[in-house]
UniProtKB/Swiss-Prot annotation:
In the N-terminal section; belongs to the glycosyltransferase 51 family. In the C-terminal section; belongs to the transpeptidase family. The lineage of its organism: Bacteria, Bacillati, Bacillota, Bacilli, Lactobacillales. Its EC number is 2.4.99.28, 3.4.16.4. GO terms for biological process: cell wall organization; peptidoglycan biosynthetic process; proteolysis; regulation of cell shape; response to antibiotic. Residues 62-223 are annotated as: Transglycosylase. It comes from Streptococcus pneumoniae (strain ATCC BAA-255 / R6). This is Penicillin-binding protein 1A.
Amino acid sequence: MNKPTILRLIKYLSISFLSLVIAAIVLGGGVFFYYVSKAPSLSESKLVATTSSKIYDNKNQLIADLGSERRVNAQANDIPTDLVKAIVSIEDHRFFDHRGIDTIRILGAFLRNLQSNSLQGGSALTQQLIKLTYFSTSTSDQTISRKAQEAWLAIQLEQKATKQEILTYYINKVYMSNGNYGMQTAAQNYYGKDLNNLSLPQLALLAGMPQAPNQYDPYSHPEAAQDRRNLVLSEMKNQGYISAEQYEKAVNTPITDGLQSLKSASNYPAYMDNYLKEVINQVEEETGYNLLTTGMDVYTNVDQEAQKHLWDIYNTDEYVAYPDDELQVASTIVDVSNGKVIAQLGARHQSSNVSFGINQAVETNRDWGSTMKPITDYAPALEYGVYESTATIVHDEPYNYPGTNTPVYNWDRGYFGNITLQYALQQSRNVPAVETLNKVGLNRAKTFLNGLGIDYPSIHYSNAISSNTTESDKKYGASSEKMAAAYAAFANGGTYYKPMYIHKVVFSDGSEKEFSNVGTRAMKETTAYMMTDMMKTVLSYGTGRNAYLAWLPQAGKTGTSNYTDEEIENHIKTSQFVAPDELFAGYTRKYSMAVWTGYSNRLTPLVGNGLTVAAKVYRSMMTYLSEGSNPEDWNIPEGLYRNGEFVFKNGARSTWSSPAPQQPPSTESSSSSSDSSTSQSSSTTPSTNNSTTTNPNNNTQQSNTTPDQQNQNPQPAQP
């Protein structure tokens, strides 16, 4: 190829490339202007507006008007320079250099997204203000069209307002936790001072809160708040806004420095605080909007009377005799037909001064013990055909965790030998549970749990009798919310419904979004019925006698977690039976409820009557919900048949010779309720060799046992 030909080829390619670039620019520009033509109009009234959201219960009665409680706007000349430096350091280094969008930041975010295959933001401070004012923050709404509109409005705002005015809008717009809107409001209520009278570390704390105000709340999460404050200070030092000496002094200042006691900021009943926190979270999850900064009407699923009654059960001795005021309770109640959360409460004696603090009802940081057995072991075994009846014989005998030399112990260190599946669950024996999980297989059990809304990063044989996991963060493991929803699938015949706190949102422009819960099939109807039939006996003759009600068809399971040998030796130092957590999960045809009890400090043990509180809270609440409602029992579905006390799948051979029916619980001792812990005679629940129980080491509590009762011998419940 000669030189002139090469030159012509280069010229042709150059022109073609340039044409493509121009075409791309024109096309991109056309698309951009199409998107921005649909953007909302920039309005100062929206930038400075005091928004509020009204929250309603399931009867459309107003519960709360959020956003109207506390808002004191700062004036531009009252904003200290150190606060401005702190905000731009942590949020937008080049705020004073760009005109609404930071192209360098956008390019950096783009490159990081390519490298990590994830989505990272490149929004400048002005764009954040626009987003807070006009748009959803949901990841699913981070579309090209939305980003184009956001950038366009940011550029427009930069042309119409000064940097100082934009900062003032932002400072007054952001939510600052505990019912405080705007940084001036937070300064007054956290420190009793105006912004211009705060110290450097105090201003750094406020500057760092808007990205996750409840997570960085210095009252509820002081460690996280301190880490965030110190990150802000580090950025200020890196940007040259403060000296190394100022930095060292500030980071060594206690996070509590200057904090005053919170005053109640809420205009809603204290018993609604935990529930409203979950409403806020679910609204943002489902719509992308934060109702604390975006005005809307939210219609929830809470039964306010039930919520109030649950509060009364927690905070009076009228229903349950609590051993002390420090023992804590967390529970969730769902409608089994649709997953609607009708009531939820995360603690007793909650401070009225903290809004939207920790809600233990949704936390997964405590162990749910043997309440996991029905959903991890026995239901999967029935679902996948490992067992064909509730009379299937399982083995309660010396057994090691599969693949190890570590023995599985029952709570009493004894063994019942060959027993029925029903009796193993009724008496909460650990060995048959672990053996069953081994037969099911870890992968199939994990899949089954996922179908019930419970996930683990990985599952282990110890999960046969506990929910312990080292990775929690609310995603993994169990909580009262997750367990109530999971057990609801037993109650309704096998369908899992995601817990729902909201059913409709009406936005400020009049548009509506409704939320229906279709549900997904988690197990066969036959599996759900067989599990229910077995768990009925847990309340009648097993470990759940404190929840028993003679007139109410219901089923459930107890749970108890354990201390390690090291914890007992170093911290507990008692020969009494103790536990860090006591649980109960149960249900009727209408409602499912899960209850956690324990102390905030896990090393404070439950002992004596404290170990009966979970079941008694459940019984009190189910009594309230079910009295006068003519509660119905479950009907045996097609595909099953009954032989005496047991249920068999069609086609399964019934070789079991049924004994005489179990004696129903006595109604003559109802005055003592189920508070009695006196051992009575054993029920007649079958075991092929109950008389040969062995107990090699009855006095030692081991870390891997999961006891659910204090009495060695099974006894009928008292109504």
